[in-house]
Amino acid sequence: MENGFLLINKEQGKTSFETLFPIKKYFNTNRVGHAGTLDKFASGILVCLVGKYTKLSGYFTSLDKEYVAEFRFGLETDTLDPNGRIVSKTDYIPNVEDIDLKLKDFVGEIYQSPPRFSSVHIDGSRAYKLALNGKFFEIKKRKVTVYNIQRLSYDFSSSLLSLKISCSKGTYIRSIARDLAYSLNSCAYVSNLKRTKVGMFRLKDSTLCENLSKASLISLESLKSFEKVYIDSNKINLVKNGVYFEIEININEFKILKSREEKILAVIQGVGLNKYKYVIIF
């Protein structure tokens, strides 16, 4: 079975889950997943995991993201995207000076409420399922980090604002559109969204599903943030059997265990000071 990860350029109109179908078919395995869901209306880089690499989903999901987003002022939909039902309208369209001033409030550590149509869990149910059934519920605000917002363009006549946003995991761009508009006494939704970066990986390095090849599969060697630890031959069987021995590691740090012959043996993750768990054993 193949093991590795892929940088897929997800197309608009497909869910992240649907994007996995051709990957499963190509590699002839159901052991395929993705890290960091992209909404159906969105496009851009989606990290997909094959084989044992599916166990690294948590790592890839935790990486920072970059998006290019388009907000349309004057309308709000229930989903805060183009596919939703219009729930609010206004004739007031903010000017660019006010937008630039308010954007500063959305940089740094901020608290935001995820959209009602999202995969957030509410008492054991997904928020979007409750919303579809017309249920009343509240979503608690969450702390996220927005590292930078750059205005790319603003067309007052069409009410379209284009932004580049760098942010931490868990940041909802749809919530930024909603909250920015509210702060300007207007309303808005995200009319277009493209993810351009996940961690160190860029959209330009991704591939469309129809262009898949075995060469598209990326190994752990490309993860420069994973330190390599070389294991002596007398300890290789210990690694293969998941036996613990002394390795210096910090909490949440990932390390690759390799033989002196450069063969990857395992991936470990720190769960405390010099304490770790095996994530993958090859």
Curated annotation (Swiss-Prot):
Q: What does this protein do?
A: Responsible for synthesis of pseudouridine from uracil-55 in the psi GC loop of transfer RNAs.
Keyword tRNA processing listed: yes
Q: Which GO terms describe its molecular function?
A: RNA binding; tRNA pseudouridine(55) synthase activity
The record's comment on protein family reads: Belongs to the pseudouridine synthase TruB family. Type 1 subfamily.
Q: Which organism is it from?
A: Borreliella burgdorferi (strain ATCC 35210 / DSM 4680 / CIP 102532 / B31)
Q: Please name the taxonomic classification of the source.
A: Bacteria, Pseudomonadati, Spirochaetota, Spirochaetia, Spirochaetales
Reaction catalysed by this enzyme: uridine(55) in tRNA = pseudouridine(55) in tRNA
For the biological process aspect of GO, one term held by this record is:
tRNA pseudouridine synthesis
Q: Which UniProt keywords apply?
A: Isomerase, tRNA processing
Give the E.C. number(s). 5.4.99.25
Q: Name the active site residues.
A: D39
Does this UniProt record's set of keywords contain Isomerase? yes
Name of this protein:
tRNA pseudouridine synthase B
Q: Which HAMAP family does UniProt cross-reference here?
A: TruB_bact (MF_01080)
